[in-house]
Amino acid sequence: MSKVSAKTIQVAVADLNGILRGKILPSKNAKKLKTKSIRLPLSALNVDLFGEDIENSPLVFESGDTDGYITPTERKPFKLTWLEKAPVFHPCWMFTDDDKSFLGDARHSLAKTLKGYREKGWTVTAATEMEFYLVNAQHGSLKPPINPKTNTQLVRADVLSTQDLNDFEDILNEIQEACIEAGINFESITSESGCGQFEVTLKHRNALLAADDALLFKVITKGVALKHRLTATFMAKPYLDQPGNGMHMHFSILDNEGQNIFSNDGDAGSNILKYAVGGCILAMKASTLIFAPFENSYERLTPKAHAPTGISWAYENRTAAIRIPMGNPLSKRIEHRVAGGDTNPYLVFTAVLGAALQGIEKKIDAPKPIQGDAYSLKLPRLAQNLSSAIDLFQNEDLIKQIFPKNLVTNLVLTKKQELKQFDKINSADKWKYYINSV
């Protein structure tokens, strides 16, 4: 990491949509980060996609729109290298004035879930596969990007093409360099199944830091793309005739000796793995709102479009919602494939790991793993639209065991307000509100 020095700093915390909210300060004021002096309204973490306060939010008029203070997380500050003045960014989270974690902050919600694992002497390691499109979003339309080497517009997908990687090497290399500056490490970069679509696999690490990595990767990728006069979008379904963007989450659990408790030296994995799968399966439908938080998200969850539609699990089968990859038994892990690229990683990790922990603690048996094409099977379905997803999330008892009560309330109010707002917008224009934000 480069030596951190700049004239300004940025401080920010993620709202419930995973959008950063914060301030720019002179660098001489960085010392305020250690004295609880940088304050934001608690309601800043509970605005809608349009940046508006939530009507009837308990965080606004009911409480007098109370402030909390933000303080740096355990991550080191880093330069936003793609910006001309390269300010130093300090990732933060929110606390209340009595020094308690503000559980309306999704990062605190995940930390609370991970505490349940630590109390058992376990550590969760996780990683994500981040899909995104590079697009040309100028002049009021959404088009594939211009190939920077040939100066012609892309007209087709070329999955796993090294030529695509070579042609877009400048932007991809700069994304990777900016990620290294931020302490984010890649496993690989590939071209994907959509025209102008790429996937970056991030390296496994402590689950809280892995969720940070996913969120910051999105920020970095969008920023670098704009520098190159392109838009990088994690919108779940930018083009109706192309595959959507997913955020696949992989995780394992290590005991206090560093041994993977999902492994039993065989291909099937341990009973604990199956209980974790059982919990994830049980909570999946009610958690659809977390995995598909916007109307556009449901365009991705369609058959034969590289995204799950039914609730299922399987060994080495990418049509299932949960996949258990084969390979070295000592590296046994769960891959949860439902979440779109438009999600808040902290909420996704909380939903998945909270459900897995419930499954382990209650010894919830997983159903029989499927074989073959999941799309051709009669399976229980995820919520089919945003409205039903909101209702399921709001009313399911298991959700209330996984997420803090005030976070559930705030998220439901947010999504109901967004649903009303999007109903007023012409369908042909809705993409404009997602493209740079989610």
Model-inferred region functions:
Residues 1-186, 210, 348, 378-438:
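ATP/Mg2+-dependent ligation/transfer catalytic cores
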Residues 19, 32, 120-121, 182, ...:
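Secondary-structure transition/capping motifs at alpha-helix termini
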